[in-house]
């Protein structure tokens, strides 16, 4: 099973990756849509819709904000025994010079790609050739 078998889906929402201090706690506010949080020894990272940053309690304590990401989802459920899936994703995106980061939910995998390359990412992950590599096109 590869990425093209799962029909990758592009979410229209622009995503931000936000870094907070290690001791930071999320504010008690309404969060809707895609949201992920990772706490490590030295930082807390939140991945969420850029619109979340319109709430001052989310933006004020951020150390660093990296905007303009889009999320490509591989709808699951993906079996836990699946081997090489993200390696296939990485190979396809690398072949098109598209940087990415990945994250997984319980049944679904996601990759974040730069918004400017999101449509191209879906094209290559769907098993199609990038436009400049299709027969009859000029590079």
Language-model features: where?
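A short glycine-rich beta-strand->turn/loop micro-motif centered on a GG-aromatic cluster
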Residues: 97-108
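A generic structural motif
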Residues: 43-48, 108-114
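Regulatory modules associated with amino-acid/nitrogen control
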Residues: 1-92, 96, 120-139
